[in-house]
Amino acid sequence: MKEIAFDLETTGLDPFKDRIIAIGMVSSGDENVVITNKDEKIMLEQFWKYLEECGNFKLIGFNNADFDNVFLNIRSLKHNVKMINLKYKTADTRLIAFNGWKYKKGKLEQFSELIGYTPKYNGWSGKQIPLLWKHNDLDDLRNYVIQDALMTWFLYQRLKDVGLL
């Protein structure tokens, strides 16, 4: 089974009004993958095609049960893009770390610092990411989304190391 850590960047928090602007993915043995496109439908089609080509996979996120997966579903519905049912194909590292309890504190950056992985963001914060997309600064956008995917990957590996997976 291919394990893929991923992260979405969006223009806001509402999947009915806001859109996905970047998807970053990291897996063992593969190069990092970043999908971004001004046309959200094309981006979603590329994402689902990538997963389909992976065959047997597990999609690993951070807070994805409450955010990323919802965005993927709602935005794909909007654009009539064929999806893969992710119900039994995902792992949410935040839920796993909290043993299934939906404790709302603890950001990805905090978990990363906790396990000793400190990414380099070039000073960007999540709230500034839509500006990178708006100003077509795709290099910084790609770097940001892949750093989040890497943080998720390292957290997932630590959860396996300590026996929570």
Question: Where does each model-flagged region fall?
Answer:
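Metal-dependent phosphoesterase core characteristic of DEDDh/y 3'-5' exonuclease domains
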Residues: D18-E31, F57-L165
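Conserved RNase H-like, two-metal-ion catalytic cores of nucleic-acid enzymes
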Residues: M1-E53
